[in-house]
């Protein structure tokens, strides 16, 4: 009799166990399908732009809402978390081109909904050991040059000489990102990005000129490469 009771008890436990397995398994399948469905729906509504820095220390994250054409830059924390930091100022058309100018500077070139070209710069560092907020324009005061291109930063603004073409930008046409990059704007479009290389030092507290290099990068959706400039004179 005892043996029969034990057998019946074990059989009941196994039956309950099998039922719970079926229930749990069914719930798991439903949750997985729900998650996949939400992911597909979110993927359709949102375009993700992800790019990792050359030294693998920083991640550029931009999410574009396909319905509103609003793109938002996210700042990452601890490598896996991201929070919205700022929205790009122009509605976008879904096309983005990302180029890392330095390990801590990412240039995002994109076309707005009205077909104009713009640049957003993700910055993840500083120069001069980050003692205080600094402005890029004054810190690169002087003449910088490379083959077929020259940049002059003076009291009235920044001038770019490229392939025989002269372009002058007043300070209200210079948009700063962080403390290490600016975008030069003309006719309501981005024209150039100027970035401070990791080797750059302003030497602002000394009597000597800036040292190191800067980089200039043309705003275009076509394939192009940044150009490194050397300091020539003040």
Label for each model-derived stretch:
Residues 82-92, 117-123, 167-177, 193-196, ...:
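Short amphipathic beta-strand/extended segments with alternating polar/hydrophobic composition
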Residues 69-73, 149-189:
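N-terminal glycine/threonine-rich, aromatic-flanked beta-hairpin/loop signature
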């Amino acid at each position: 009799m005892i043996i029969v009771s034990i057998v019946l008890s074990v059989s009941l436990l196994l039956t309950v166990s099998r039922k719970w397995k079926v229930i749990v398994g069914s719930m798991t399948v439903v949750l997985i399908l729900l998650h996949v469905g939400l992911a597909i729906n979110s993927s359709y509504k949102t375009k993700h732009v992800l790019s990792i820095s050359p030294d693998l220390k920083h991640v550029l994250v931009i999410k574009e809402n396909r319905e509103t054409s609003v793109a938002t830059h996210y700042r990452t924390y601890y490598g896996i978390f991201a929070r919205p930091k700022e929205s790009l100022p122009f509605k976008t058309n879904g096309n983005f081109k990302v180029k890392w100018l330095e390990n801590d500077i990412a240039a995002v070139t994109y076309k707005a909904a009205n077909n104009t070209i713009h640049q957003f710069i993700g910055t993840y560092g500083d120069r001069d050991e980050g003692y205080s907020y600094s402005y890029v324009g004054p810190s690169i005061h002087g003449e910088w040059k490379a083959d077929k291109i020259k940049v002059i930063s003076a009291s009235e603004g920044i001038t770019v000489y490229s392939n025989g073409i002269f372009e002058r930008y007043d300070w209200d046409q210079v948009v700063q990102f962080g403390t290490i990059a600016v975008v030069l704007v003309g006719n309501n479009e981005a024209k150039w990005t100027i970035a401070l290389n990791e080797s750059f030092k302003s030497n602002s507290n000394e009597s000597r000129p800036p040292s190191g290099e800067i980089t200039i990068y043309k705003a275009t959706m076509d394939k192009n490469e940044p150009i490194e400039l050397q300091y020539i004179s003040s």
